[in-house]
Amino acid sequence: MSDRPKTVVLVVEDEPLILMDAMQSLEDAGFDVIEAYDGEHALVRLAERPDIGAVFTDVNMPGRFDGVQLARIVHERRPDVVILVTSGAIKVEWSELPEGGRFVSKPYRGEHVATLIGKLTGTASP
């Protein structure tokens, strides 16, 4: 058993069932998970929780900005945070994401997302 703290993942998703599924998959993989329902709420969470190590966000959300814009803002404020962006409606190009950001198309397997976050945060076996 590892003594290192669990990686905290912020999941940003406005669809409750998708949010619950993503959170459950990440929790099952050993991550601590918190949620936000839009970009503005995500930025509040990011400010409240300096221990957040990864953000997994949907692209299409209500509010002032979408998930790609959120990814850029998060990277500006916290370049140490791993960023994954997801969508089933559009394909996000690498050039649209901040440095190091990744795109995962919906539908996705929760285990795949958990493995990717583990690799990118250096906690491949959370």
Model features per residue range: what roles?
Residues 1-10, 16-17, 76, 80, ...:
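Non-catalytic signal-transmission and effector/linker regions of two-component phosphorelay proteins
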Residues 35-54:
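Acidic, metal-coordinating helix/loop segments flanking the phosphotransfer/catalytic sites
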Residues 44, 68-80:
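Short amphipathic alpha-helix used as the core "switch/output" element in two-component signaling
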Residues 58-59:
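Active-site residues of response regulator receiver
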